Amino acid sequence: MKNNRTLGLAILSLLLFIGNAPLAAKVKNYTLSSPDGGLKVEISTGDGLSYRIMHENDTILSHSNIGLVLADGTLVGKSSRVTRERRKKIEDKVESPFYRFKEFVAACNELDLKLQGGFGVTFRAYDDGVAYRFYTTVASEVTVKDEVAEFNFLQDYTAYLPYTTNDKKPMAMAYQNVYDVTPLSKAQPKLAFLPVTVDCGSVKLTLLESDLEAYPGMFVQSQ
């Protein structure tokens, strides 16, 4: 029997408790594929904003809600009406003086969805991964109170979780620990820091952050 499992996300000092939610009745889907066609991400908009990831037509990440909660109560992603859609191909040469190659090419396909209200979300599909980022065109200062980020799996896969070592102040630690290898259904209800890996059978899915300036700020928690 398949067990639906959810990983909730905590950003910086914010802990979110997120559950599965049904898709909106009025949904518009946008599909983005990697350059080699092996990875595909399907973004759904309507009453909410969600995405799912497929590898060789197998769903490895089920529909997972994303969004922002602003300090003024605005819910970015809820009732998400797309006002503009832009697509482009990207090939960036990245210098890597400390890698075994002096440079490498990061190639992807990008989908930019501008949402009503001065916000938007950009998705990128690489041959070996998918990324997304929220942005705003609002001229004034914006304070983000919470971020919604779900990672929903269709089966009770094996996860590799590095839990926090500080139970009293779980976000105050050295980000060093051994990995606990466990089915998602047996995961402890405590914060785990990144990277986290889930063995989906045919592929392994690893959760990571980008554009970090200091210590990691993302934590996940099994729900």
Model-identified regions with their sequence ranges:
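Bacterial N-terminal signal peptides that target proteins for export
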Residues: M1-I11
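Bacterial N-terminal signal peptides
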Residues: A10-G19
